[in-house]
Amino acid sequence: MTQPAVYVVSDSTGETAELVTRAALSQFGQTPKFIHRFHHVDSSHMIEEIVDLVAVNNGIIVHTIVLESVREELNKTAQAFGVPIIDLFGPLLNQLEETYKIKPLSEPGRVRSMDEAYFNKVAAIEFAVENDDGRNPRGILQADYVLIGISRTSKTPLSQYLALKGLKIVNIPIVPEAQIPDELFEIDPQKIIGLKISKQKLTKIRQERLISIGLPGAGTYASNQRIDEELAIFDKLASKLNCFVLDVTNKAIEETANEILIHIGEIVDENLEL
């Protein structure tokens, strides 16, 4: 079998067409003479020059053009030049359109943009883990948003939930024994979200926590004095930072996260108007 010269044509990067072509050639034990990519071909005036080059080199065309007008022009021109052409997307798009009764978006590069969104989420999740519970105060400067709150205000699960939305979140516990990170005062207060909870609810949660680990009534963790002290420290800090404060009492993680996302959306809209 003669080694083929393969020309990949795409209105995006051409990675999909090249990957499929290499996979197909491997079934014949062939290494292509070369695979040349013509990427971001999004207008018909480029087509004749490309097809002429392929014809001169006795090559074949494999393409993943999603723009219908460009795809039809490429297929027609290749036939006119007698160039073998494989349309990877056209038949599939047509069949899916017929099956689902909807028109394709015809937007090149959507897989790539979806991949980028996926990897952004992965990076955000890793960031949330690395910056959980105040373990890396310097992360505050790289975060999209910072959650602050006393113990049992759902900071960690909220950080993970918001990370799934692609947001880089740091959460900082507010406890009397720990120094408040200086970095909190170096960022825009709009990036800080305080999480507060009622004394009654917090007392109940902490008492149940102690029971679950076999230490009912132990220490000061669930004492009135301790809880009053922590709530006072939080209120003072939130006031000093002039940050947005959200009451999480009796709210599910999803509900609180949704309120945070709504608040974030309002910040974005406000900044766009400035």
Swiss-Prot record:
InterPro entries: Kinase-pyrophosphorylase, PPDK_reg. ADP binds at G149, I150, S151, R152, T153, S154, K155, T156. It catalyses: N(tele)-phospho-L-histidyl/L-threonyl-[pyruvate, phosphate dikinase] + ADP = N(tele)-phospho-L-histidyl/O-phospho-L-threonyl-[pyruvate, phosphate dikinase] + AMP + H(+); N(tele)-phospho-L-histidyl/O-phospho-L-threonyl-[pyruvate, phosphate dikinase] + phosphate + H(+) = N(tele)-phospho-L-histidyl/L-threonyl-[pyruvate, phosphate dikinase] + diphosphate. One of its GO terms (molecular function) is ADP binding. Its EC number is 2.7.11.32, 2.7.4.27. Keywords: Kinase, Nucleotide-binding, Serine/threonine-protein kinase, Transferase. The keyword Nucleotide-binding applies. It is an enzyme of class 2 (transferase). Pfam families: Kinase-PPPase. NCBIfam families: PRK05339.1. Bifunctional serine/threonine kinase and phosphorylase involved in the regulation of the pyruvate, phosphate dikinase (PPDK) by catalyzing its phosphorylation/dephosphorylation. Belongs to the pyruvate, phosphate/water dikinase regulatory protein family. PDRP subfamily. This is Putative pyruvate, phosphate dikinase regulatory protein 1. It comes from Listeria welshimeri serovar 6b (strain ATCC 35897 / DSM 20650 / CCUG 15529 / CIP 8149 / NCTC 11857 / SLCC 5334 / V8).
